[in-house]
Amino acid sequence: MKIINNKFQKITVAIIFSWLIFFVLIPNLLVLAVSFLTRDGSNFYAFPITIENYTNLFNPLYAQVVWNSLSMSGIATIICLLIGYPFAFMMSKIHPKYRPLLLFLVVLPFWTNSLIRIYGMKVFLGVKGILNTMLIDMGILSAPIRILNTEIAVIIGLVYLLLPFMILPLYSAIEKLDNRLLEAARDLGANTFQRFFRVILPLTMPGIIAGCLLVLLPAMGMFYVADLLGGAKVLLVGNVIKSEFLISRNWPFGSAVSIGLTVLMALLIFVYYRANKLLNRKVELE
């Protein structure tokens, strides 16, 4: 029986590593290699080797796009956290009988393609859309306001798509809280705010960091959200990559932008693991 289990484990590990090598490592190495080549009109890329593609990343135009991507993704992440934390906390405190239903409602949007959902959001936010019509009927607005083709529309779209990715890790972290710690804090005279900021918040920080990463990292590359809700006025890093590959046909520079985004994501993941390790050590010491 042990021999069978060992063989099964080896086969499973081999399949996983093979998948990672062929579909993650090799494609990224190819992109890295192309990023050091020169643009060619007929073959997309050619020799000689150059680092000009990476020096172009520091062009003020592209630096502004990176800053816009970080700022809009950061704002969307903060909004997701402010909405997701109370919702996840509520989910963990209701009767266990109703939790599966709420979890089902959280993951239900994943059953529909995100592109179709963004088209629906475009209709919702339009000048003659549901939102403007509802606000006018309620007397809040006297005339429709333009939300589409603005940064606000892009942020709304990012929050709409990525909110479940914030709720799920937060719910997992909050559900694991030891109620005895909260009772002990209450017995020691801690009020509601003190219990939250000194007990609940530190213990759920790994879930907060994980949720922020799961929202922030994909948000920077969702070019179709900026295309449909922001028009030509709002650009994310993903829009630059798409444009360089499909429109400008500058594959080397598009590859360099992709590698730059990958490095940025890797740094953020490294920060997450370091912060998570330090938080766990702090909790153990306390």
From Swiss-Prot:
Cytoplasmic side, ranges: 1-13, 92-100, 172-199, 273-286
The family annotation for this protein states:
Belongs to the binding-protein-dependent transport system permease family. CysTW subfamily.
Lineage of the organism:
Bacteria, Pseudomonadati, Pseudomonadota, Gammaproteobacteria, Pasteurellales
Recite the UniProt keywords alphabetically.
Cell inner membrane, Cell membrane, Membrane, Transmembrane, Transmembrane helix, Transport
Q: Which GO terms describe its biological process?
A: transmembrane transport
Q: Which domain of life does this protein belong to? A: Bacteria
The portions of this protein that span the membrane are: 14-33, 72-91, 101-120, 152-171, 200-219, 253-272
Q: Identify its membrane topology class.
A: Multi-pass membrane protein
Its GO CC terms?
Answer: plasma membrane
NCBIfam families recorded: PRK09497.1
Indicate what this protein is called per its UniProt record.
Answer: Spermidine/putrescine transport system permease protein PotB
Q: Where is the ABC transmembrane type-1 domain?
A: 66-274
Which InterPro entries does the annotation name?
MetI-like, MetI-like_sf
Biological function: Required for the activity of the bacterial periplasmic transport system of putrescine and spermidine.
Question: Which cellular compartments is it found in?
Answer: Cell inner membrane
Primary localization:
membrane
Where are the Periplasmic topological domains?
Answer: 34-71, 121-151, 220-252
